[in-house]
Amino acid sequence: MNHKKYKKIFYREIFFIVLALLFILPLAIHGFVPAGDDWKYHANRILEIACNIKRGNFFPMMYTYTFKRIGYLLGAFYPWLMLLPFSIFKNMTSNINVAIGLGYAFYIFIALNLVYHVTNKLFKNENQAILTSIVYSFSGYILTDCFKRMALGEFLAMIFLPVAVYGFYAVFFDNKKDWPYLAFGMSAIILSH
């Protein structure tokens, strides 16, 4: 790649970082995450993983620090891998609201890049890919999952859905060598929700 192309990528990534930070602006203004339907459940999961990471347990199956300390075997039945960024941010900031906001920003940044990549692969048009990534990442459904319902599993699954859809399209209609997109997209969705 030449210098001009690297510069273009750099500016696009800076733009995506700014957009990801704008996504969490309502949280920054109000200072808290709205308590949606699943707030307590997901907050406890994030706190549990954060506590386990602090104590050197990187694969928590039995939840003993949260959920009233009853020894809930939640880690064995509900995917926790995609919650690691939230838990790492929790350990870095020690505030669950800030951790969730930073986690949202992290995954919106990932979504912007994934949607940009698959749209650009399909249509070979960078402007269309950028616009599509913004429209998708700031869609009403994703905003509702984050700021109204606190449906973290659905939010995370929606981040990887475009990759799975592109992979499905590529395998069945266009480019069979792009099967890893389907595998990655579906695996990430399964690990999300």
Language-model segments: which ranges?
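Membrane-interface transmembrane helices that cradle and orient dolichyl/undecaprenyl
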Residues: 162-180, 186-189
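Hydrophobic alpha-helical segments with strong N-terminal bias
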Residues: 10, 15, 22, 63, ...
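Membrane-interface junctions at the ends of membrane-embedded or membrane-associated helices
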Residues: 1-8, 122-124, 170-180
